[in-house]
């Protein structure tokens, strides 16, 4: 055993220097701003209008100037000491620019009035722009800045035009508000926004747009419009997002963000759009592995539908890439590293020299893509295989960038047996490699990796096989039919399913276990003969984990397999809570953008940028630093586990929680999130990647079936989780609510045991999402260790009586939880 995970209660003592708190400290807030600057993406900069020259007079337009959205709603929300909007950010630099005041006062008063009415940030209607203010502003300045903001959140998906039926969701008030505001869906500008933009364009020679959004939106309205000079994709930048945007607009920081998603010309251009709201009870992933750029770069006719490609982003300076090289690198003999074939080399190493040939210091992102032979399985035209961001290069400075790509990471999964059933394999043929600065801006390298025969990288077994998915897309844009089978309930149903889940869940919220207090001095008293074995003795190797668990009664074991009540600052419940044997009540906290504490507690924390922005940094170091800072805040506020990062795939722009997630690409999402996990766990705080898996829709999220092929599940939707598990050994994994191919994920032995534990070697604790619809005893059998926010002790005991469960099943689940708490999972430190 290396270290304890931080689960034992200690007072809320400051962890900073000189007795100061680190939570919401200036250091952490500055880090949040730095991260926001690093991930904002400059999409357009005609005539080099940006950065704004010193002495420029500017006029601000759009309710988004004050209606700033720091992040999305639900678990991703954070209670903060303040929020700095775009106007407040620009106001920090009044020595550099002059801001027209009448439009400022107009929008400030309007937004304040709307907030007083209880309308959420980002859900405010664009007001009509008074013509007298516009005329006066045009006389004052020739540069205009327009701010557009959007909001979405947990429990509901983004508005889309043309869907007239009522959609099952949990945030009907926000959906109704969206229906009032967004004429064409929130992907597009509203009529009021279009009118405001038109008025501004007609009166100013230089128009700059700042997009304060959490996900993909329409870009056609400005891409081909010569009257709009520059566009900054500012995303949702956390507590200091307005200041970060201001620093980029004024050239205090040179933008270096790159898109983590493809921006198509229309919402309808994404293959997922057509069926997203087709039915509340299921979603067919018929596009299969062709998600994001894999679709647009591969499928015939799709390339021209792209406005801004994956990996794209401008800078205020210019970089020259030269001296491209690629060569094989064999770290060890194939049999020594467990490869199945001696012909399989370890890696290709690609390198290029990046030189800043402009006049401004800046950073560039080098991206390595590969192209596998189509073979019998069919492949995307390009797949991201590696990336690296340069340091800040001064004008004239160069850096040699080297990226390694392991050959086994190019393997495809054969689910139907076209080559070898249920195998990860490399098909024979030529593998090509590309280096560049976006998926479109690449150079073909002069090294080709050629296989004369198919190579099996890993033989597994079929899991999560689809039962109702009728077809899937192929690389040529056609579809193949898939075999249909009946969903199988792995475990016998011994309890009737509730007819009204809503009432059941509401009852369970009130039924959470009571705190079982124990005199804290007893924790430090030496054990006496006859005393029960204590958990601390397991950590000290005085008692085996098996002996410790063996002494527990069935009732105690069953209790430990459910969530425990909130104490201290918590509002997402805890794990453990068996003080008579020294098992503490380890508290958890949300969420992906910072430690979330309920406003009524009175403790504020740092809101970091949304995960989409963090992905756009293409910088693992900044994600690690955010993880360290967030872990410190969790530690100082006495939490043992932080329910982050969220790494579901941006399958569709319509998903309401895309702001919590990183990218359309699983490799980028996995690497960025793995760095964050490493940072979190350097504090001995348990990181909890979620939502495992295929949580790509919020509407009817507890009843919707995600129907996907096994290949798509493994190559796209599980891959980010796999990277995190294998590289950083997270202490926990949080499941999702939805159904996957006819079976609830929390009841899926294939997912929780077959893939997560047996194939990937996961050793942490698996927890359900809070008050899901899975049956507790089935979850225990499948491999779910703790049912959150509370368990069903009586049901587990009855299941034992009815022979549906055995005591050893409870013991197995508790042994996994105990290993996590005592940190035998070896939480990795920096």
From Swiss-Prot:
One GO molecular-function entry: beta-glucosidase activity
Reaction catalysed by this enzyme: Hydrolysis of terminal, non-reducing beta-D-glucosyl residues with release of beta-D-glucose
Pfam families membership: Fn3-like (PF14310), Glyco_hydro_3 (PF00933), Glyco_hydro_3_C (PF01915)
SMART domains: Fn3_like
InterPro entries, sorted: Cellulose_deg_GH3, Fn3-like, Glyco_hydro_3_AS, Glyco_hydro_3_C, Glyco_hydro_3_C_sf, Glyco_hydro_3_N, Glyco_hydro_3_N_sf, Glycoside_hydrolase_SF
EC number assigned by the record: 3.2.1.21
Protein name per UniProt: Beta-glucosidase A
């Amino acid at each position: 055993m290396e270290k304890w995970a931080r689960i034992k209660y200690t007072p809320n003592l400051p962890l900073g220097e000189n007795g100061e708190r680190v939570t919401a400290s200036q250091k952490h807030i500055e880090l949040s701003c730095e991260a926001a600057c690093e991930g904002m993406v400059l999409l357009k900069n005609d005539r080099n209008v940006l950065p704004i020259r010193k002495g420029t007079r500017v006029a601000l337009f759009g309710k988004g100037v004050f209606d700033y959205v720091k992040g999305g709603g639900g678990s991703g929300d954070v209670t903060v000491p303040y929020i700095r909007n775009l106007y407040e950010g620009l106001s920090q630099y009044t020595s550099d620019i002059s801001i027209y005041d009448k439009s400022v006062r107009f929008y400030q008063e309007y937004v304040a009035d709307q907030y007083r009415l209880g309308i959420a940030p980002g859900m405010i209607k664009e007001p009509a722009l008074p013509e007298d203010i516009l005329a006066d502003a045009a006389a004052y300045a020739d540069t205009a800045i327009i701010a557009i903001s959007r909001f979405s959140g947990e429990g509901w998906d983004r508005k889309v035009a043309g869907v007239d039926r009522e959609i099952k969701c949990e945030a009907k008030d926000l959906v109704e508000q969206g229906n009032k505001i967004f004429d064409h869906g929130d992907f597009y500008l509203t009529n009021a926004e279009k009118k405001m933009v038109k008025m501004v364009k007609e009166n100013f020679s230089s128009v700059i747009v700042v997009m304060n959004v959490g996900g993909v939106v329409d870009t056609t309205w400005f891409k081909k419009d010569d009257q709009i000079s520059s566009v900054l994709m500012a995303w949702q930048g956390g507590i200091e997002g307005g200041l970060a945007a201001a620093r980029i607009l004024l050239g205090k920081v040179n933008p270096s963000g790159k898109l983590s998603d493809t921006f198509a010309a229309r919402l309808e251009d994404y293959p997922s759009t057509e069926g997203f709201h087709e039915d509340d009870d299921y979603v067919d992933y018929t596009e299969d592995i062709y998600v994001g750029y894999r679709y647009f770069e591969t499928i015939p006719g799709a390339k021209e539908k792209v406005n801004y490609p994956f990996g794209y982003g401008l800078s205020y300076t210019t970089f020259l890439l030269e001296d491209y090289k690629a060569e094989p690198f064999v770290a060890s003999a194939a049999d020594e590293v467990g490869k199945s074939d001696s012909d399989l080399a370890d890696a290709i190493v690609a390198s290029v020299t990046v030189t800043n040939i402009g006049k401004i210091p800046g950073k560039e992102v080098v991206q390595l893509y590969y192209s596998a032979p189509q073979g019998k399985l069919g492949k995307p035209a390009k797949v991201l295989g590696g990336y690296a961001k340069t340091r800040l290069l001064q004008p004239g400075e160069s850096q040699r960038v080297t990226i390694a790509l392991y050959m086994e990471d190019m393997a495809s999964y054969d689910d139907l047996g076209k080559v070898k059933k249920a195998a990860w394999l490399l098909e024979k043929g030529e593998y090509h490699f590309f280096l560049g600065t976006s998926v479109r801006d690449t150079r073909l390298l002069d090294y080709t990796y050629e296989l004369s025969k198919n190579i099996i990288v890993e033989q597994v077994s079929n899991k999560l096989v689809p039962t109702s998915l009728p077809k899937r897309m192929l690389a040529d844009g056609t579809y193949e039919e898939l075999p249909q089978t009946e969903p199988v309930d792995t475990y016998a149903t011994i309890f009737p399913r509730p007819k009204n889940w809503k009432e059941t869940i509401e009852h369970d919220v009130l039924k959470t276990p009571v705190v079982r207090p124990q005199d804290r001095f007893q924790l430090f008293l030496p054990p006496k003969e006859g005393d029960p074995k204590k958990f601390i003795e397991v950590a000290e190797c005085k008692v085996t984990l098996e002996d410790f668990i063996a002494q527990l009664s069935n009732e105690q074991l069953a209790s430990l397999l459910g969530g425990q009540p909130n104490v201290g600052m918590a509002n997402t419940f805890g794990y453990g809570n068996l003080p008579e044997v020294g098992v503490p009540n380890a508290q958890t906290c949300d969420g992906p953008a910072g430690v979330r504490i309920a406003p009524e507690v009175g403790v504020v924390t740092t809101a970091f940028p949304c995960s989409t922005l963090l992905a756009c940094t293409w910088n693992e170091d900044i994600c690690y630093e955010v993880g360290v800072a967030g872990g410190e805040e969790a530690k100082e506020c006495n939490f043992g586990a932080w329910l982050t990062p969220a790494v579901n795939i941006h399958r569709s722009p319509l998903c309401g929680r895309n702001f919590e997630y990183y990218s359309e690409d699983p490799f980028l999402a996995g690497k960025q999130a793995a760095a964050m996990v490493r940072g979190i766990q350097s504090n001995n705080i348990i990181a909890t990647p979620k939502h495992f898996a295929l949580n790509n829709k919020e509407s009817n999220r507890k009843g919707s079936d995600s129907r996907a092929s096994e290949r798509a599940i493994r190559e796209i939707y599980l891959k980010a989780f796999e990277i995190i598990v294998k590289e950083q050994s997270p202490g926990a994994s949080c499941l999702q609510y939805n159904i996957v191919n006819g079976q609830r994920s929390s009841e899926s032995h294939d997912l929780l045991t077959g893939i997560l534990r047996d194939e990937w070697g996961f050793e942490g604790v698996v927890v359900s999402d809070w008050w899901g619809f899975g049956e507790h005893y089935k979850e225990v059998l499948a491999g779910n260790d703790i049912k959150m926010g509370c368990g069903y002790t009586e049901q587990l005991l009855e299941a034992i009586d009815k022979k549906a469960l055995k005591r050893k099943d409870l013991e197995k689940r508790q042994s996994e939880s105990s290993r996590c708490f005592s940190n035998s999972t070896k939480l990795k430190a920096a």
